[in-house]
Swiss-Prot record:
It is found in: Cytoplasm. InterPro entries: Aldolase_TIM, FMN-dep_DH, IPdP_isomerase. NCBIfam families: IPP_isom_2. The gene is fni. Involved in the biosynthesis of isoprenoids. Catalyzes the 1,3-allylic rearrangement of the homoallylic substrate isopentenyl (IPP) to its allylic isomer, dimethylallyl diphosphate (DMAPP). One of its GO terms (molecular function) is FMN binding. GO terms for biological process: isoprenoid biosynthetic process. Substrate binds at R6, K7, Q152. Its EC number is 5.3.3.2. This is Isopentenyl-diphosphate delta-isomerase. GO terms for cellular component: cytoplasm. It comes from Bacillus cereus (strain AH820). FMN binds at A62, M63, T64, S93, N122, K184, T214, G258, G259, A280, G281.
Amino acid sequence: MVRAKRKLDHIEYALSTGQSRTHGFHDIEFVHQSLPNSSYETITCETKIGELSLSSPIFINAMTGGGGEKTLHINEQLAYVAKHHNLAMAVGSQMAALKDESEAASYKIIRKVNPNGIFFANLGSEATVEQAERAVDMVGANALQIHLNVIQELTMPEGDRDFTGVLQRIEKIVLNSKVPVIVKEVGFGMSKETMQQLASVGVTAIDIGGQGGTNFAAVENERRQRMLSYFNNWGIQTATSIIEATSTNNNLSFIASGGIQTALDVAKAIALGANTTAFAGYFLRILMEDGIEKLVDEIDLLHTDLKFIMTALGAKTIEELQSVPLVIKGETYHWLTQRGIDTTHYSRR
């Protein structure tokens, strides 16, 4: 019951705190192309996460489940939207359903709505191999997300305080999983060192979950009597974290999330090196405040605008968009310089 109440609290406070939009994309500027040699009608947006083919570089990221009828209804609506647009979708952490079978329906609903969709299961880094297998089977998942949320847990009044052995648990899950494993942050970004460690244990993809979207430190602080306000501005911005990711020069796929709301955000994230982008809080707000049809329309506009931007840049495919020239400025440039990451190749390609 406590876990279910927390799920509902997270929805309420995530909507009330909003998104910070401190993602750093304002420091990224495309180099204008006066002769793009492109046509809107021939632009294609297919992409891949590992060997998993996606029809769009936009997917619906993990939000909820395990909070009774309300979370069931949210996942039902999100699954409908995913089916309508042929988008991949992740569910929120399934630990609630593993501990209380009555909550499983709030996750299983997605397969009832969209039997042939691409879905990601989701568990925290405390999960065992057996729990990971059950979570995947619960929703017939095509991949498994393992989320890292140290700052959220520390800020959460009833959260975890012991984070030893996490990498080893992830490695065991990777070795035993029948589906690709994606490791994701929840709004605090990832450093290149963390991503190199994750690559070393064989994960397929990393969702950098950068600072700039829903602030789960702020969400949990709303639930505390004594606020840990020093965590409210903690983390690595989304744009910076994507560049840290690509600087590792490994074969992982990268997912950009954290405050992404516009087609320009999507285009910049992909141009920095992401394979796809994920929306959560922004889509949830539209769904809860304006309804399902408004969300369907918004995703239509996102795809239209992304194709306009790709046409302007002369990028006919997502792969070509990953190679267009851009300039990195401001705080993002200074951070990367201090971290020893060369940015000149972005502007000269």
